[in-house]
C-alpha cells in the first residue's frame, strides 16, 4: 500500500514539470482590454488553480495593483504586453510575498525597463528569466523527490504503518516548508537592498 502511495506521490511531483505557465511567445503582442487580460490569464494558468472557482486574476486585483503602484496605469483602458509581464510576476510573487515586498522588487525593474527604448524591456527580461527557470524545473522536481524519500526514512522506529506514514508525510511537508521559508527569508533580505537601487 505504501509503495503505491509513494509512486503516486512521485508521479504528482513529476507532474509539476507539466504545470501551465505562460511562455514568452504566448504573450499577445498587442494591447488588451482588462477583460481580455483576465480571460487570457485564466485560460493559460487554469491548471495552477487549487479549486475550480479560484480566480487567477480579476478586474479588482488589476485596479488594486495600479492603486498600489505595482502596475503602471493603462493607456486608454488598454494594457500593453509589458503590463502583462508585470501581472505575471505579481501573480507568481503574491503566493509568498507581501504586496509591499512585491512593490519593492518590481519598482526599480518597472522604472528601468517598462517601455524602455534601450533594447532591453520587460518582455526581454521575462524571456531571460523564463528560460532560466524552465531549465531548473527538473532540478526542483528531483530535489523534492529526494526530500520525499528522505522523509520516508523518518520515524522508521514506529511500528504502526498508519502513524509512521502520517509522520513521514508531516516530515515531508516540513522539509518543503523549511525550504520555502529559507528562500523567502533570502528574498525579503534582498528586497531591503532593492530600496537603494
PLM features: residue spans?
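Basic helix-turn-helix/winged-helix DNA-binding cores
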Residues: 2-111
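Conserved small/polar residues in nucleotide/adenosyl-binding loops
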Residues: 195-196
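Exposed, interaction-prone assembly regions rather than primary DNA-binding/catalytic cores
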Residues: 104-105, 109-181
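Short, hydrophobic/amphipathic alpha-helical patches that form generic packing surfaces
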Residues: 86-95, 169-190
Amino acid at each position: 500500500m505504501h509503495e503505491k502511495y509513494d509512486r503516486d506521490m512521485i508521479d504528482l511531483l513529476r507532474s509539476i514539470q507539466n504545470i501551465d505557465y505562460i511562455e514568452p511567445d504566448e504573450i499577445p503582442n498587442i494591447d488588451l482590454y482588462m477583460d481580455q487580460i483576465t480571460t487570457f490569464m485564466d485560460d493559460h494558468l487554469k491548471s495552477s488553480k487549487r479549486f475550480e472557482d479560484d480566480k487567477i486574476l480579476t478586474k479588482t486585483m488589476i485596479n488594486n495593483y495600479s492603486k498600489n503602484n505595482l502596475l503602471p496605469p493603462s493607456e486608454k483602458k488598454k494594457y500593453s504586453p509589458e503590463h502583462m509581464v508585470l501581472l505575471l510576476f505579481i501573480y507568481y510573487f503574491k503566493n509568498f510575498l507581501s504586496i509591499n515586498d512585491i512593490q519593492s522588487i518590481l519598482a526599480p525593474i518597472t522604472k528601468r525597463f517598462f517601455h524602455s527604448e534601450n533594447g532591453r524591456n520587460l518582455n526581454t527580461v521575462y524571456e531571460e528569466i523564463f528560460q532560466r527557470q524552465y531549465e531548473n524545473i527538473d532540478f526542483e522536481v528531483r530535489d523534492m523527490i529526494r526530500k520525499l524519500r528522505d522523509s520516508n526514512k523518518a520515524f522508521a522506529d514506529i511500528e504502526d504503518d498508519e502513524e509512521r506514514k502520517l509522520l513521514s508525510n508531516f516530515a515531508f511537508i516540513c522539509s518543503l516548508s523549511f525550504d520555502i521559508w529559507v528562500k523567502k527569508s533570502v528574498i525579503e533580505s534582498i528586497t531591503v537592498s532593492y530600496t537603494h537601487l
